[in-house]
Amino acid sequence: MKFFIVLVAALALAAPAMGKTFTRCSLAREMYALGVPKSELPQWTCIAEHESSYRTNVVGPTNSNGSNDYGIFQINNYYWCQPSNGRFSYNECHLSCDALLTDNISNSVTCARKIKSQQGWTAWSTWKYCSGSLPSINDCF
């Protein structure tokens, strides 16, 4: 019985680190609830699919400049968020990179929309997979 209690406690503590995995439709609905126009949802869901497989807790491998990419949209810590190791960042989204790794994607969505407004869709290297005809998200609503 003690083992079972310890196991349940360990799993409960580990659960936040596991992150959330969205589906295309659950991400589209969540982003729409956060104010993203329906007309942009096919592009955003495509980017999330190719950047993180819809997972919120992904930290990408180290880039050639020593930076990393965080969260469902793989937002770069050199320009957009402050890494926890104190490394220099322009931190244009004014948040910690850890805030991009939570199940609550509001920070990720706000920051990603800022990136898009400043740099366009091509800020994401995976845009090449998303710039053509995409499946409708109408079946998600």
From Swiss-Prot:
Gene3D superfamilies the UniProt entry points to = 1.10.530.10
**Active site per UniProt:** 51, 69
Q: What's one Pfam family here?
A: Lys
Question: Could you tell me how activity relates to pH for this protein?
Answer: Active at acidic pHs. Inactive above pH 7.
- What would be an example GO MF term here? lysozyme activity
Q: What class of enzyme is it?
A: hydrolase
- EC code(s) of this entry: 3.2.1.17
Q: List the disulfide bonds.
A: 25-140, 46-130, 81-97, 93-111
Q: Which residues are glycosylated?
A: 65, 104
Q: Which UniProt keywords apply?
A: Disulfide bond, Glycoprotein, Glycosidase, Hydrolase, Signal
Q: Does the keyword Signal apply?
A: yes
Per the record, the domain of life is Eukaryota
What reaction does this enzyme carry out catalytically?
A: Hydrolysis of (1->4)-beta-linkages between N-acetylmuramic acid and N-acetyl-D-glucosamine residues in a peptidoglycan and between N-acetyl-D-glucosamine residues in chitodextrins
| Signal sequence range | 1-19
Domain C-type lysozyme per the UniProt entry, residue ranges:
20-141
What this protein is reported to do is described as: May not function as a self-defense protein, but as a digestive enzyme, probably in the gut of the insect body. Inactive towards Micrococcus luteus. Active toward glycol chitin.
Q: Which family does it belong to?
A: Belongs to the glycosyl hydrolase 22 family.
Name-wise, this protein is Lysozyme 1
Q: What is the lineage of its organism?
A: Eukaryota, Metazoa, Ecdysozoa, Arthropoda, Hexapoda
